[in-house]
Regions:
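H-loop (His-switch) and adjacent beta-strand-loop-beta switch element
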Residues: 261-274
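ABC-family P-loop ATPase nucleotide-binding domain
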Residues: 1-55, 275-301
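ABC family nucleotide-binding domain
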Residues: 41-257, 261-264
Length: 301
């Protein structure tokens, strides 16, 4: 499930490789020193993204809202990044822009090296279907369809010529097995618990093998225990399969277990917190390890 490759671009603005930052480097032994200069593929890059909402024509209120005000960051292939911030901080707008659901006022968004907002609406819709998987707080499953049909639906919608219906059937069942609910494949979502429905939603997000999975408060409708189980599944996907995940959450405890947290306030990045793991030096994690220490904080002025 890993995606992407290191791309060599001449233009610095389009540089989709990144060298491990020495400020965030873990100490390494002699046999690991080569990792310090390794380049790491970037799945997502935002460059000075702004989103401004102008007052509607005829509206009595003439307030201009800067929902996003110069947001720039990168997400590496296989990284699990959490977006944290108070209500109204711009988190939802940011996720909508990353997910190509809304165009920015200015700035660039690159997914797998492609400047997606240079595309027209038709091609942008195709990119959204092929490269992005969505997980919503409210699951957004279709109750008249079976669990398996829900998982397969994005593949059917995409109508990929390279993928047959039998391929989609097989992949859907494989994903349901990985997520521990293959035995529910023929049931309807309404017959499942909240945690099981969110597992179906995760499988659906992965069916087209996306470059990026966007999760909007995926544990928000679940109790603490079930929410942690769902989060652990997302963490497993990054650790075991190299899935790239960007998650919006209000849960600071869960955010602290992701690879990196980006705090946003008033449409700007306030700070980034790097939760150090083996992945920070280019080494795949052997298991889903809880990171108890926050070792590096980068304040963004």
């Amino acid at each position: 499930m890993s995606h992407g490759s290191t791309l060599d671009k001449k233009d610095p603005a389009n540089d989709f490789t990144m060298t491990t930052d020495s400020k965030h480097m873990l100490s390494v032994g002699p046999d690991e020193s080569h990792l310090q200069s390794a380049t790491i593929a970037v799945a997502l890059k935002l460059d000075n993204v702004k989103k401004i909402f102008e007052p509607r024509s005829g509206s009595a209120k003439k307030i201009v809202v800067k929902a996003l005000d110069g947001v720039s960051f990168e997400v590496r292939v296989g990284e699990f990044v959490s977006i944290v911030g108070p209500s109204g901080s711009g988190k939802s707008t940011l996720l909508n822009v990353i997910g190509a659901l809304d165009r920015p006022t200015s700035g660039k968004v690159f997914i797998k090296g492609q400047d997606i907002f240079l595309l027209d609406d038709t091609r942008l819709s195709d990119v959204r279907s092929r490269l992005i998987g969505f997980i919503f707080q409210s699951y957004n499953l279709i109750n008249r369809m079976s669990v398996q049909e829900n998982v397969e639906f994005p593949a059917v919608f995409l109508r990929r010529t390279s993928s047959s219906s039998s391929d989609s059937h097989t992949r859907a069942l494989e994903l349901l097995e990985i997520l521990g609910i293959k035995d529910k494949a023929k049931q309807k979502p309404v017959d499942l618990s909240g945690g099981e429905q969110q597992r179906v939603a995760i499988a659906r997000a992965l069916i087209n093998d996306p470059a990026l999975v966007l999760a909007d408060e995926p544990t928000g409708n679940l109790d603490t225990k079930t929410g942690r189980e769902v989060f652990d599944l997302l963490k497993m996907l990054t650790d075991r399969f190299g899935t790239t995940v960007v998650m919006v959450t209000h849960n600071l405890e869960l955010a602290g277990i992701t690879d990196r947290s980006i705090y946003i306030r008033d449409g700007r990045i306030e700070k980034e917190i790097l939760h150090k793991t083996k992945s920070d030096i280019g080494l795949p994690s052997a298991s889903a390890t809880t990171n108890k220490d926050i070792d590096s904080i980068r304040e963004v002025k």
